[in-house]
UniProtKB/Swiss-Prot annotation:
Annotated family: Belongs to the NifU family.
Site entry (Mediates ISCU dimerization and de novo [2Fe-2S] cluster assembly), positions: 36
Role, per record: Mitochondrial scaffold protein, of the core iron-sulfur cluster (ISC) assembly complex, that provides the structural architecture on which the [2Fe-2S] clusters are assembled. The core iron-sulfur cluster (ISC) assembly complex is involved in the de novo synthesis of a [2Fe-2S] cluster, the first step of the mitochondrial iron-sulfur protein biogenesis. This process is initiated by the cysteine desulfurase complex (NFS1:LYRM4:NDUFAB1) that produces persulfide which is delivered on the scaffold protein ISCU in a FXN-dependent manner.
Modified sites of kind Phosphoserine: 15
Gene Ontology annotations for the cellular component aspect, listed alphabetically: iron-sulfur cluster assembly complex; mitochondrial [2Fe-2S] assembly complex; mitochondrion
Protein location: Mitochondrion
Origin superkingdom: Eukaryota
PTM: Cysteine persulfide is reduced by thiol-containing molecules such as glutathione and L-cysteine.
Official protein name in the record: Iron-sulfur cluster assembly enzyme ISCU
Modified-residue entries (Cysteine persulfide), positions: 70, 139
The gene coding this protein: Iscu
CDD domains recorded: IscU_like
């Protein structure tokens, strides 16, 4: 009960501060939304394939990449079936809207592709699809790097699987 009362007081105090501050015209309030293309906003507000897969599984590849310049961190995972087709993909991204949108789009694009086909996905394709401005190209580069890292991890697991002696 005390927590609810405290939260209510906090909400009222915040509202009072907002009401006392000068109001911005609606035109100015909506300006930041125009900085992102509608495709970025869609993937940001409705991200596809958020979550994690079992990284210990032999058929799951995990890529973890980061951009020191902006602090974005992206984890992308793929699940590959016995025929070499990517059947699932998940991501978790700590970053801006463009980084989240790039991750979301990348997981959509890798699904249904073979491991080799997924290697052909380029950051320029992601940037073009999302209409990213030059200042946000590093986000699409992170997505490409995350795909490559996940594929490399998967391939490494497959090689070690072949080297393991068969259990009898």
């Amino acid at each position: 009960m005390a927590a609810a009362t405290g939260a209510g007081r906090l909400r009222r105090a915040a509202s009072a501060l907002l009401l006392r501050s000068p109001r911005l015209p609606a035109r100015e309030l909506s300006a930041p939304a125009r900085l992102y293309h509608k495709k970025v906003v869609d993937h940001y507000e409705n991200p596809r394939n958020v979550g994690s897969l079992d990284k210990t599984s032999k058929n799951v590849g995990t890529g973890l990449v980061g951009a020191p310049a902006c602090g974005d961190v992206m984890k992308l995972q793929i699940q590959v079936d016995e025929k070499g087709k990517i059947v699932d993909a998940r991501f978790k991204t700590f970053g801006c809207g463009s980084a989240i949108a790039s991750s979301s789009l990348a997981t959509e694009w890798v699904k249904g592709k073979t491991v080799e086909e997924a290697l052909t996905i380029k950051n320029t394709d992601i940037a073009k699809e999302l209409c990213l401005p030059p200042v946000k190209l590093h986000c699409s580069m992170l997505a490409e790097d995350a795909i490559k890292a996940a594929l490399a991890d998967y391939k490494l697991k497959q090689e070690s699987k072949k080297e393991e002696p068969e259990k009898q």
